[in-house]
Structures are given as C-alpha cells and as structure tokens.
A protein has these predicted regions:
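Sec-dependent signal peptide recognition
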Residues: 4-12
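Hydrophobic h-region of N-terminal signal peptides that target proteins for export
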Residues: 12-20
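Non-catalytic tandem-repeat scaffold regions and their flanking low-complexity/translocation tails
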Residues: 19-185
C-alpha cells in the first residue's frame, strides 16, 4: 500500500512538474496536445475539432487541464479514454471520472506511456450508488475534497469509493479537507 501511494505521488509530481504548460490546441481544423517541457506536440486522433472542449481553466482538480472531450470521446493527455462517454462527463478527482452511466477509475500510470492512443479505465460499481446524482459535495472553503454524495448517501474516495454508512446526507457539512460533520456526529 505504501509503495502504491508513493508511486501515485511520484506520478503526480512528474505530471505537475513536466506537463505544467501542457494544453490542447486547435490548428488547421485538427486538435493537438502539446507538452512544451518534453518538446512534444501530437495530433489527438479521432478528435472532432468543431465540438472539442478542453477542461483547462476550470480549476476544480489538479487534473482538469489534462482532459478534453468532443461529441464522441473523452481524452486524457491527448489519448482517448476507452469506453467513456462525453455525455455528462465529469472529473471527480485525480483518480476518478464519471459519465452519464458509470464511474471509472483512471490508471494515471498508464497515461504516462506514449505508445498507445487509448487509455483503459476501470468501471467502478458501488452498491446503492446513483451515478446520475453522484457529485462532489460543495463546501464553504472552496477546497478540493474527497467527499462525494448522491441523492441518498455520502461517500469518501481515496483508494476506493466507500459509503459512509451512518452519515446523514441532508445535514452533512465539510469543515476541512478531511473533516466533516452531520447531525449524528
């Protein structure tokens, strides 16, 4: 577990340090993903320039600027995310994304290899979780948090998506990154 967390931290440092100026570009009716640090500029295969949208500038998660979508596909670091629909696509945090039907875990380590044009995702299923209403819980501090909720329950995401069984969805309030309260606790 410690090794896995260390690897994840290392990957995030590499991404943050070396792809800090990376961006999607529209040129001559084509979409490109540019990483100036590596002096790499590659065409995003199958991307539709007319409907393409980058998530850069959204500033909800560290990963926002690495994602883009068009009317057919979702892309991470210029590579197509396999089986992810652009319909209602949302970046939940560094490891998890969702579309209109499913929640997925993204293998960030896989995204760093430049040999493939597609990135595999792992579909996540949690008993009772309503994907349509699953969202990041709002907080007064405007901090990125690992607390999420659907219409009925509260969840905490770290390595997995865990339901907080005794949490009251209606009174749940985030106090800080790891600290929250509800009427029961």
């Amino acid at each position: 577990m410690k090794r896995k967390n260390l690897l994840k931290i290392l990957v995030l440092f590499i991404l943050a340090g070396s792809i800090v100026n990376a961006e999607y570009l529209k040129e001559n009716g084509e979409i490109y993903y540019e990483m100036p640090y590596f002096e790499v500029k590659s065409k995003v295969k199958e991307a539709d320039a007319k409907s393409f949208k980058s998530f850069e500038g959204r500033n909800k998660t560290v990963m926002d600027s690495y994602y883009g979508k068009d009317n057919k596909n979702v892309y991470l670091l210029g590579k197509k995310l396999k089986n992810v629909s652009p319909k209602e696509f949302e970046i939940l945090n560094e490891d998890y994304i969702k579309d209109d039907k499913n929640i997925y875990k993204v293998k960030l380590e896989e995204a760093l290899f430049f040999s493939s044009n597609e990135i595999n995702t792992k579909k996540i299923s949690v008993d009772g979780l309503d994907v349509k209403t699953f969202r990041t819980l709002e907080n007064d501090k405007e901090i990125e948090t690992n607390y999420f909720g659907d219409k009925n329950s509260v969840y905490y995401i770290y390595e997995n998506i865990d339901k907080i069984k005794e949490a009251d969805r209606n009174s749940f309030k985030i106090l800080d990154y790891y600290i929250a309260k509800d009427k029961n606790n």
